[in-house]
Amino acid sequence: MAKSSYEKPDFWTQKAKKEGYPARSIYKLEEINEKFRLLKKNMHILDIGAAPGSWSLWVLRKFKSFHDQSMLVSVDLSDLTIPKDKPNFHFIQGDIFSDVVQKQLITYGPFDLILSDAAPATTGNSTVDTSRSEELVRCVLDLSAEHLKTGGALVCKFFIGGGQQELLSQAKSTFKTVRTYKPEACRTSSFETYLIAQQKL
């Protein structure tokens, strides 16, 4: 019998619940990190579109094994569902692209690694959704150029559409190495993938 297309998402959802994560998306980040070895000791990390908090919680759990000066700053319009009482964790509730939040980022940055699992509100119209996603990624790339350290890295979700090559070209103007990668934890039917940009120029 053929496997249901939702069998894999059910597996990841149950695994996330068992391990105490708010959402299954954590396994996308975990796989990306295993493949590209992005997380290292003594990093300042920015998590964009952090709610409900799975990626932030995963990073904080990694920090516990480092015993160093690592720091995480997470930003989202919505509140997080994870504990925020960590000395090396700062949550900013607001618009990442607003002047107010940008000034706060300058205080905490520059960053070694920027993570973005952010996505626009979807409409069900693939043309509209991919266009909105591409615009969001362009803004994240601009932000990365401003707030990433030289040599830093970016992980950013985007929806595959007609503007993919333009996004890659923009990334290549700022980073030495640019790839796309779709983790196993992504739904097979999903048109989301991740931009992996390393070694900021």
Label the predicted regions.
Residues 77-121:
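S-adenosyl-L-methionine
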Residues 41-51:
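Conserved class I S-adenosyl-L-methionine
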